[in-house]
């Protein structure tokens, strides 16, 4: 079963991206590199609970 999640930038704290993940295959929190307009570069975004 897929669940929608919000990704928050570690450096700026902004919540920009919505995505989904399969809880059964990935029970731990997701960490992705995405583009941050404030920083004007790619940054690490972590899953918000």
Swiss-Prot record:
InterPro entries: Ribosomal_bL33, Ribosomal_bL33_CS, Ribosomal_bL33_sf, Ribosomal_zn-bd. This is Large ribosomal subunit protein bL33A. One of its GO terms (biological process) is translation. GO terms for cellular component: cytoplasm; ribonucleoprotein complex; ribosome. The gene is rpmG1. GO terms for molecular function: structural constituent of ribosome. Keywords: Ribonucleoprotein, Ribosomal protein. Belongs to the bacterial ribosomal protein bL33 family. It holds the Pfam family Ribosomal_L33.
């Amino acid at each position: 079963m897929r669940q929608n999640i919000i990704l928050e930038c570690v450096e700026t704290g902004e919540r920009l991206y919505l995505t989904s993940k399969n809880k059964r295959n990935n029970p731990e929190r997701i960490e992705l590199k995405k583009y941050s307009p404030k920083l004007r570069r790619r940054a690490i975004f972590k899953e918000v609970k």
